[in-house]
Amino acid sequence: MIAEIICVGTELLLGDILNSNAQFLAKQLANLGIAHYYQTVVGDNPDRIKQVLAIATDRSQILIFTGGLGPTPDDLTVATIADFFETPLIERPEIIEDITKKFARRGRIMTASNRKQALIPQGANILPNPIGTAPGIIWQPVQNITIMTFPGVPTEMKSMWQETAIPYMQSQGWCEQTIYSRTLKFWGITESSLAEKVAPFLEKENPTVAPYANYGEVKLRISARATSLELANKLIIPVEEEIKDIAGIDFYGINDESLASVVGKLLLESGETLAVAESCTGGSLGSMLTSIPGSSEYFYGGVISYENQVKITLLDVNLEDLMAEGSVSHVVAKQMASGVVKKLGTNWGISITGIAGPGGGSDTKPVGLVYIGIARYDDIVESFEYRFSNLRDRNWIRRVSVSTALDLLRRKLYLSKQRPQHHQA
């Protein structure tokens, strides 16, 4: 069986909203082991929806629609599908009853326009919506074609998918084998370099190993097709362990682990604490750290020293060094890191100062130049220079700077685990 995702909505075509439904469904189909080769976005236009249907029914057997199930005139998905298959719409009283109850729970009366949502093709099964008023359908209008419709609201779509669609597909025998995946994450190595190191694994068929990169992070997805998670892990884990050995310290986490969560785990294990001093990243590093539940146990806080006087007043950065070297320099990065350690009384301090652009660069200090400082309570202070000039985008430079700073600390913490610890008294 081949599935196809069709997302209906002019707002998607215009880029007004992100098409997160397609991403979710694509991952779900892969996990279920259902082949999926095509995705289409089409506006709220009956003729164009029919054109998409004509193409999709010729190449796929499971057509998954999202969007266009609401009560407004431009919500045309179900009516257009029914018209395409020359099938009448029937008002279903159980849908009317469900919508009426949902309105009553909010102290309201169902509007006349909502009756439209109770119209579904004759012979179609109702796909209940436990959250909203728009039900979906599961329908086999002709042999070898199954239509599923979901609302465009992601929370509603996901709930209906999990509670009804997956059990239905499993009951049809479409998911005899499932694809199980684990994603290994790396920082400090390029996608091409990692691919070269693990080249023999990229040729495997079960499990498959696929590299991809985003915002400087490289990932390897190891996927195995099997009838159970236990059998899949027997295929995946040996490959995973070999790749981790090859990558060494460039490997940092699995699946949902982030650099911030890994750093937090290492700090908890060592009983150490952290503070940050930020300039060009404007608090992004602190935000990343505090996004981890329980981070107050090791993260004390930070200073956003965007203006030079703040660097001097709050972080004890030397005015003469600022005048001589500039705020974007090794010496200032070091003083920011050591300053925040002393001010907040932590074991570790990280600083970031740089030129995120789009303006402010020069021949000697171009946009993308970033210095990251790392200080320890025992006065060991280092700084590292990075040139992210190839990114040429302010948000990218800031984001990569934060991740690079976290990775630097991760490596320091990992190496310090290998030798005896001497904590601050």
UniProtKB/Swiss-Prot annotation:
CDD domains: cinA (cd00885). Transmembrane segments: none annotated. InterPro entries: CinA, CinA-like_C, CinA_C, CinA_KH, Competence-induced_CinA, MoaB/Mog-like_dom_sf, MoaB/Mog_dom. Belongs to the CinA family. PANTHER family: NICOTINAMIDE-NUCLEOTIDE AMIDOHYDROLASE PNCC (PTHR13939), NMN AMIDOHYDROLASE-LIKE PROTEIN YFAY (PTHR13939:SF0). This is CinA-like protein. It comes from Trichodesmium erythraeum (strain IMS101).
